[in-house]
From Swiss-Prot:
Pfam families associated with the record: YgjP-like
Protein name listed in UniProt: Uncharacterized protein MJ0123
InterPro entries per the UniProt record, alphabetical: YgjP-like_metallopeptidase
The organism's place on the tree of life at top rank: Archaea
Annotated organism of origin: Methanocaldococcus jannaschii (strain ATCC 43067 / DSM 2661 / JAL-1 / JCM 10045 / NBRC 100440)
Record-stated family: To M.jannaschii MJ1213 and A.aeolicus AA15.
Amino acid sequence: MKINENKKDIKDIVNEILISLNINESINIEIKPMKQKIASFSFKTKTLRLNKYVVENFDEELLHYIILHELIHFKIKSINHGIKFENELRNYFSKNECDEIELKIIQKLI
């Protein structure tokens, strides 16, 4: 799905992140309205679910972070945000960068 003319296709962003995480498995992508979440990942069906509002209204930087976040869960095979998760995320963003991006996400949602 093309976000808009100025943004990359979601599949392209996902594929870039899969490559950077050295994940050699294919995943499904669903974009749908979600009331409580901006994204989720199902280990059972290998499905990345993205909130339609987020896809349509967030810029590429924020989408990249959200997708990376979910795919790190897939890579480490855990829903937790423990040391393994944090270490993997730090390969891409510093703690300060994460805090700044997460603040932007919150501001876009309120």
